[in-house]
Amino acid sequence: MKNKCLLLLLFASFPIFSWADETLDSLLHVLDQAILAHDTYVVQRESRIRHLKELAGDVAPNSIERYNLNNQIYKEYKAFICDSAIYYLNENVRIAGNLGDTDREIESKLQLSLLLSSTGMYTESIDVLKSVDRQKVTSHLILDYYTCFDHVYGEMGFYTQDQTLSAYYREISSAYKDSLYAILSPQSEEFMVMRETLFRDRHKYDEALEINDRRLMAAEPDTPQYALVTYHRS
């Protein structure tokens, strides 16, 4: 889990230089530079976290203000210390429950599920999803809801050594992908990422690269988004 968190930190925290048609060696070179600067960015992130915690300590423990500050702390931690990110999401689930705020409770559960599946905690991720009442998922969270199911079952299908289970998990993931395609705009980043991944998995590299070119044109250089798009080219 620590290795996955380190990769998240590298993409979330460090400036990435332009290398639209460079090789994987170029990406590794940039990551090496990021690792060398790691201590500096850790100090900066820890400073932001301390400040947010100080602010959180000055507001009521069961309040929207505390929820929002916890959410900011979670975002700082999620690419830094995953265990702490999980803790603050669970705190927000508790706060939202105490407030009777179903929408925010579901929002935090979906964030938690995605974080858990991104760090290999698939059983825990599915348990969280099972605790979400589909009938209470509002329209602005339905995309996140489908994404969580698609992601966790897609990851399980990829990493399991059992081919029968792999096919089963991939079938579930594919069903949620279909649901996502039905509600996403073809011009959206999420839609294009899914199509690019599909083409790449089917070894249709020209089609995948064409979509990646469009994503790269829309991404601002020296940002985490630009880094992710260029990473997908390697």
What are these regions (language model features)?
Residues 1-5, 19:
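Short, Lys/Arg-enriched, disordered terminal segments
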Residues 4-14:
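Sec-dependent N-terminal signal peptides
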Residues 15-234:
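A "functional boundary" signal
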